[in-house]
Amino acid sequence: MKFLYDLFPVILFFIVYKLFGIYEATAAAIAATIAQIAWAKITTGKVDNALIMSGVIIVVFGGATLWLQDESFIKWKPTILYWVFTVGLLGSQWLFKRNLIRGLMEKQITMPDPIWSRLNLAWAIFFLLLGFLNLYVAYNYSTDLWVDFKLFGTMGLMFVFVIGQTLLLNKHITEQDKK
């Protein structure tokens, strides 16, 4: 259910784009993200940092899209978000000696430190490349195709990446983790 909740603004963007256009879809994505932030605050009393970051980026880039009537800003939004994730993953590990991926997953699985470092690096590289791929699609194909890619392409790539990571990490997961 959380997966659909997290994808709500993207799915809404896709639907509204197909029905009305890029500017209406951008406004819907901004509203949906603000609603998500408000809902999280009301129901749990706290808002996840990634959601806050996504909210700031969609308001800034989506707002620029609407204000300037230039769709290139909204096309940059996923790339900026992915690159913020990249910087966060690498910066936290290299500057603060804190592995964010480990922090998210260590309650579920136990692995040696070097494996956690490689996993963190793999995610950082994945987000970096996904950002470049988003720009490539945005500027070399139609907006229609970019919108399709934004939902289905990135979700598909994420799914394949997670499956690949799971297969690679499986040999490092202890028997206790499998219980």
Swiss-Prot record:
Gene Ontology CC terms: plasma membrane
Keywords tagged on the record: Cell inner membrane, Cell membrane, Membrane, Transmembrane, Transmembrane helix
Subcellular location field: Cell inner membrane
Topology in the lipid bilayer: Multi-pass membrane protein
Disulfide bonds: none
Transmembrane intervals: 3-23, 49-69, 76-96, 119-139, 149-169
Top-rank taxon, per record: Bacteria
One Pfam family per UniProt: IspA
Purpose of the protein: Plays a role in cell envelope biogenesis, maintenance of cell envelope integrity and membrane homeostasis.
UniProt similarity note: Belongs to the YciB family.
Protein name: Inner membrane-spanning protein YciB
Source organism: Methylobacillus flagellatus (strain ATCC 51484 / DSM 6875 / VKM B-1610 / KT)
Gene name for this UniProt entry: yciB
